[in-house]
Swiss-Prot record:
Any one of the GO CC terms: protein-DNA complex
Family: Belongs to the LysR transcriptional regulatory family.
Record's protein name: HTH-type transcriptional regulator BudR
Lineage: Bacteria, Pseudomonadati, Pseudomonadota, Gammaproteobacteria, Enterobacterales
Annotated function: Regulator of the budABC operon for 2,3-butanediol synthesis.
InterPro entries: BudR_PBP2, LysR_subst-bd, Tscrpt_reg_HTH_LysR, WH-like_DNA-bd_sf, WH_DNA-bd_sf
Domain HTH lysR-type as annotated: residue spans: 1-58
Keyword field: DNA-binding, Transcription, Transcription regulation
CDD domains xref list: PBP2_BudR (cd08451)
Positions of disulphide bridges: none
UniProt DNA-binding region: 18-37
GO molecular function: DNA binding; DNA-binding transcription factor activity
Length: 290
């Protein structure tokens, strides 16, 4: 059954007159009457009762009218939705966010701006470590990913840097240097470092590990946390000190003091990664924002 038959029938049912319906549809009356008769033959029962001055719906016609309106509405909505997806105006966007960057305000600011500009696009964020995100992006389970650089596995994708931030030191309030402002890692050579696992952010892990080692910190004494954020909780509990990205200073714990790092060379970048030869208009719309 063709959709145009349904449109013709609905037009006649609402106009209660073949002549007016034909005028509304922009066709002549004889072809319209023929199409309605063909529809009735296909269904196997009359839908309209022909009167002297128009038509009225039969009982079957009343039921069919309700269903026809729903089918046409769904068809029109599906068509508009598909057109919108092709234009990147609706559909969905699944961004991955590495847990080490989840506290950086610019990421969610960008996502919010995109949602405001394209409210019909459904956003579903996925948080994970770098290895998980890079695999998911390669398997098209994610559309984009916010990653920490440097990252060897991200080199297979297009990258665009969106932020750079320095590293800072988290100390327990009881530490003798907690009242100081900027600190060097060499001043903490006798302290116990708290460090996250390498799979969380491999490049950042190497930076932190090598930076501490070069400053004389004994990394064999290091305590390992499950995530960067949990390393701050371990500092709060008294396990040692942590070297983390500046955006993590938004985590306020009662026993943690924050200190800028004197070595300005220790810094990290956040980038957006997406697949090469990406065809999604929604992804392209997002990238057009900056």
């Amino acid at each position: 059954m063709e959709l145009r038959y349904l449109r013709y029938f609905v037009a006649v049912a609402e106009a209660r007159n073949f002549t007016r319906a034909a005028h509304d549809l922009g066709i002549s009356q004889p072809p319209l009457s023929q199409q309605i008769q063909r529809l009735e033959r296909e269904i196997g029962t009359p839908l309209l009762r022909r009167l002297t001055r128009g038509v009225e719906l039969t009982e079957a016609g009343e039921s069919f009218y309700v269903d026809a309106c729903q089918i046409l509405a769904l068809s029109d909505a599906a068509l508009e939705k598909t057109k919108g997806i092709a234009r990147g105006m609706n559909g969905s966007l699944v961004p991955g966010i590495t847990s080490s960057a989840a506290f950086h305000s610019q990421i969610f600011s960008l996502l919010y701006q995109f949602q405001q500009r394209y409210p019909a696009v459904a956003l579903r964020q996925v948080e994970g470590n770098m290895a998980t995100l890079m695999h998911a992006l390669g398997e098209a389970e994610l559309d984009i990913a916010f990653v920490r650089l440097p990252c060897e596995s991200s080199k297979a994708f297009n990258l665009r840097i969106i932020a750079e931030e320095p590293m800072v030191i988290a100390l327990h309030r009881s530490h003798p240097l907690s009242g100081e402002s900027a600190l060097s890692l060499a001043q903490l050579s006798d302290a116990v470092p708290v460090i996250f696992p390498p799979e969380v952010a491999p490049g950042l892990y190497e930076q932190v590990y090598d930076g501490c080692r070069r400053a004389g910190v004994d990394m064999s004494r290091a305590r390992q946390s499950s995530q960067i954020s949990s390393s701050i909780s371990m500092v709060d509990a008294g396990f040692g000190f942590a070297l983390v990205p500046q955006s993590m200073t938004c985590i306020c714990l009662p026993n943690v003091t924050w200190h800028p790092l004197q070595d300005a060379s220790l810094k990290t970048e956040i980038a957006i990664a997406w697949r090469r030869f990406e065809r999604s208009r929604t992804v392209k719309r997002f990238l057009e924002m900056f």
